[in-house]
């Protein structure tokens, strides 16, 4: 039986990794915004951040709150509808549920910091529409499903807004906004798991349909280029007032190019983007904070890494 063949019996699982590496890991890493203390963040916001830093953080956080619902719907409606296997559907429903937790948590941050007077930083509309058109698919043709799943998993879950996550993390490395930083850490670990398992599902599709990788190649390359364009424009918008004390826009753009290459390789394709390796390496702390070590180790998240048991690390160790 293949991925698209219905199996009435719950077990035995034909694709057990979507249970053990997907559903179970996400379940073990369950968290809620109520676990995060924001008292220190409010004090930092009122007493330590300057106006340009407030402008940056406030507009980023408002943008986050507007993006999570669509991501949840993709997992719970599209993926569940396409793949009848119980182990895949369970994983997708768990991932979608976790995205709703992100939405509530971002709203909590916005309310706690009082961000009603800020305007959300969002991806540039025309370019974002081009990307959405590549993700959008409502049919049942394997090529359409594979293209949509690959682009969504690799880029929407694995690259989109990672520049903003990195900006917010950079404050925690200065011992500021630790509550925001903790939430970003848990959120990015979730997104990274979702991306990893979605890419793996695409690779499984390619194993069962040997033409699929080539059939989707052009659209996926276009999507990768579009995502890098989106992120670079977004970085320009975030840094319109100038670089941060410990983070440069140029370094962040190189990091995004490197990360997009990594996701392309995860899908089974070759790297597409050239980048400044030294500048990109200035963001190696991002891999540490999101549950990996550096580079290729990032996607081999061990159960002890992907849990809340290890959250008490000293951020001075990053250096």
Question: Where are the regions that the model predicts?
Answer:
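Non-heme di-metal
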Residues: 1-319
């Amino acid at each position: 039986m293949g991925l698209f063949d219905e199996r009435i019996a719950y077990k035995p699982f034909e694709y057990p990794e979507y249970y053990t590496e997907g559903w179970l890991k996400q379940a073990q890493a369950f968290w809620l915004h109520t676990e995060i203390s924001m008292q220190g963040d409010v004090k930092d916001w009122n007493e330590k951040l300057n106006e340009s830093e407030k402008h940056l953080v406030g507009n980023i956080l408002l943008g986050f709150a507007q993006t999570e619902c669509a991501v949840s719907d993709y997992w719970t409606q599209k993926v569940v509808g396409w793949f009848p296997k119980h182990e895949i559907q369970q994983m997708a429903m768990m991932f979608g549920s976790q995205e709703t937790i992100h939405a509530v948590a971002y709203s909590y941050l916005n309310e706690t910091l009082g961000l009603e007077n800020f305007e959300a930083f969002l991806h540039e509309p025309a370019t974002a529409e081009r990307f959405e058109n590549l993700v959008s698919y409502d049919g049942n043709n394997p090529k359409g499903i594979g293209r949509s799943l690959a682009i969504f998993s690799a880029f929407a879950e694995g690259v989109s807004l990672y520049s903003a996550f990195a900006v917010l993390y950079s404050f925690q490395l200065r011992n500021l906004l630790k509550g925001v930083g903790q939430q970003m850490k848990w959120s990015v670990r979730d997104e990274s798991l979702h991306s990893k398992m979605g890419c793996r599902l695409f690779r499984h599709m390619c194993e069962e349909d040997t033409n699929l990788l080539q059939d989707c190649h052009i659209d996926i390359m276009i999507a990768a280029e579009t995502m890098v364009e989106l992120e670079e424009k977004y970085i320009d918008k975030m840094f319109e007032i100038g670089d941060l004390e410990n983070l440069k826009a140029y370094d962040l753009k190189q990091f995004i190019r490197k990360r997009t290459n990594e996701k392309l390789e995860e899908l089974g394709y070759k790297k597409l983007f050239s980048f400044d390796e030294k500048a990109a390496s200035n963001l190696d702390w991002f891999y540490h904070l999101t549950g990996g070590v550096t580079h290729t180790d990032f996607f081999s998240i061990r159960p002890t890494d992907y849990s809340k048991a290890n959250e008490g690390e000293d951020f001075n160790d990053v250096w």
